[in-house]
C-alpha cells in the first residue's frame, strides 16, 4: 500500500511537471526543430528539449547517416533518414530550426551537412567540436548559431597545451601591437598560461585600453603592464627593453591593409620593416631569449608592397638569427635612429648625429650592446610564423560583408574567382604559441590551412546564414581587383619546400638563402630612402626581394629609363 502511494505521488509530480512544461511552451512561439545526429549528444539535446521550460523548439524529426537507426523512435521523435533526406523532411515537418548535434564530426563532414542545411533558410545552431566541450558537457546552452567558420571545412588546430604552458610560465612576455586583432588574442592566451609579466605595447591607446580592461576583469592576479609607443621610435623601444627585459617577444605590430599601403609604400617600409628591425635589435641588445615575428602568406611571391614588406621582415628575422648565432653584432648597421648612443649611462640623441663627429663605427657600438646583455645569455632565437587571412580581424572581409548585409547590400567582391586561405584568430594564435616551443632559430613556420576558399562562396554563405537569399534579397557586386591584389595566394615559395614538426598542421619552410651582409647594406639604404619618402622605394624593394613582382602598374613605381 505504501509503495503504491509513493509511486502515485511520484507519478503525479512527474505529470504535473511535464504538463507545466507543455503549458509554458504553448504560451511561447514554438519552433519546429530538426536534430542532426542520433548519437549520445543528439539524444541529450532531445531529452533537454522535451523537458526544458525555456526552450521554444519542438523536436519533430532526427537525421542520422547510420541506416541502422532509420525508422527508430527516440523519445517519441522519428529518425527519418540521412543527410540526403534533410530537404524533404524540412518541408514535410515545416521545420524552421535545425540543431547540429554531432560534436565528434570531422570538419569536412560538418561542412557538407551544413551546406545542405543552409539551403533551407532555417535557423542553424550547432554544438562546438568535442575539443571545445569542457568535460564533454553537452547541453542546449552550448548550442551556438552556425558561423561562417563552420562552413570552411577545416579541422581545428590541436596544440600541446602542456608544452605551451611550460614555455610561457614564469616568463616576462612583450607583445607589440598588443591591441590589434592578433595581438589582443595573443595577450588573452598568454594571460591564461601564468606568465611572470605580460607587457602590451601599442601605438593606439583605445585598443590597448580595451584589452587592458578585459584582461584585468578576467585575470585578477595577472602582472600586466600596458605601454603606449611606436616600434618606429628607437628610444621608446630601447627604454621598454631596458626597464622590463622581456624573455619572449611577439612582434605583431604592422601595417597590413594592402590597398592603403600601395599608395603609401614608404610607410609600409618604415613601420613594418624598420619597426621590425628596431624591435629585433633591442631584443638582441637586451638579451631576450626568443623573438617571434607574425608574418603572412602575402609574403610568398608578393605582388604588393605590404606582402613584400613582410618578406623583408622575414629576411630581417633570419639575418638577426644568423648574427645572433655567430655573435657578430658588429655587422648590424645603424638604421636611421635605430639605437641611441649611451653617454655617462644616459640615452642621448640620434647616433647618426654623433657618428661623423666622434668617428664612431658600428663595431664601437657593440661595447654598449654587450654590456646590457645577461652574462649567461646564449643568444636570441629569431623565428617567423606565417599564416593566411584571419576571420573577423580588423579590416577583413567578414566584418565588411556583415555591415553590407545589415545595410541591405550590395555585398562587394573584387572578383568571382578570387580565393584566400582562412583561419580563426584563436587558431592563428595557437599556432604562434606552439611554434615558439618548436623554435631553434631562423625558421619560418607555416600552417597547413587546408583548401583555399572562394570569397564569392564565403559571401553567399554569409548572406544565407543571415536569413537572406543571394542575388534575390541581397545583391552581389564585383568591383575588380584592387591595386596589388592577386587572385590566388600561396603558402610557400617553391624554393622553400617544407619540413614536418610534431604537429601535423605546422610545417617549417626551408629558407631561401641570401647574403646577410649584402642584405643589411641594402636595408640601410632602404631605411634612408623610406625616411626621405623616396619615389623609388618600390623599385628598391623589388631589387632586394627577387620574388616581388608588382601587379600591374604600381602607383608609386618609378621605372628605370
Q: PLM features: what roles do these ranges have?
A:
Residues 135-136, 251, 255-314, 319-337, ...:
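Conserved Rossmann-fold NAD(P)-dependent oxidoreductase catalytic core, especially the SDR/UDP-sugar
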Residues 111-127, 197-204, 248, 263-290:
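NAD(P)-cofactor binding segment of oxidoreductase domains
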Residues 141-145, 149, 153-245, 344, ...:
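N-terminal Rossmann/SDR dinucleotide-binding element
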Residues 90, 94-96, 195-196, 241-250, ...:
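Proline-aspartate-enriched helix->loop->beta-strand connector
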Residues 158, 163-167, 319, 323-335, ...:
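Strand-loop microenvironment adjacent to phosphate/nucleotide-handling motifs in alpha/beta enzyme folds
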Residues 1-20:
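Transmembrane alpha-helices and immediately adjacent membrane-cytoplasm interface residues
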Residues 17-135, 203-212, 217, 224-225, ...:
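A solvent-exposed beta-alpha-beta segment
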Residues 83, 110-172, 284:
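Flexible, Lys/Arg-rich cytosolic regulatory linkers and terminal tails that connect or flank
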